[in-house]
Amino acid sequence: SSSSSSSSFADLGVPKQIVDALRAAGIEKPSVAQLAALPELIDSRTSEDENDAARSQSMPSIAMQSHTGSGKTLAYLIPIFCDILREEEAMEKMDRNQKRHVNDVRAMIVAPSQELAMQIVRTIETVLGPYGRDITQQLIGGANARRQEQGLRKKRPFIVVGTPGRIAEMSRMGVLKTHGVSTLVIDEADDLLASNFRRDMARINEHCGKGVKGGRRT
């Protein structure tokens, strides 16, 4: 469309570091889905130098319906990348004792299948490279649970991508800390809200973002 050809990621408020990473991955222009979602989600969380009243405003939630290949995955990943960049910059100013308390996952991405979860992780790694691997933990059923538990303890990841059963299991065990989740993504929500996922999704929904000022966005 003409709007997509005239808008860039920078125009939408995406920081230069992330624009450069997208370009290096061969992603030059935002898709229609990204043009619709990014203005709603980027900069919705206030920066660290703004006052508490502004920071505690409720976070926006959006629902998106789009076809395969529309760029939907990056439409929700790019705002997460922006949050992580902002938090990394804030952490550089913290002392060691303050950093010790920054252990919670910040973004939870729930998918109905192993295949979709792995595809999302590949997208993160395509854009962020080795750093993406360092900050992301995959939690999917059918894979080695002990290894995933060790990954959570060792990495202290910013992003968790997984299937409902394994995420809920790790949460019940107390290994996965979700009260600091500021973004919950329910990918293919029509499948995830079906009856066979209902119990696990209820737990995920209840626990994610409990400790976030102004609540999480979904």
Task: List the predicted regions and their residue ranges.
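Alpha-helical interaction elements in eukaryotic regulators
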Residues: 14, 18, 30-34, 73-76, ...
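Conserved nucleic-acid-binding Ia/Ib motif block in the N-terminal RecA-like helicase ATPase lobe
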Residues: 27, 89-172, 180-183
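Conserved pre-motif I regulatory segment
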Residues: 4-65, 82
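Intrinsically disordered, low-complexity accessory regions that flank the conserved helicase/ATPase core
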Residues: 1-11, 20, 24, 88-93, ...
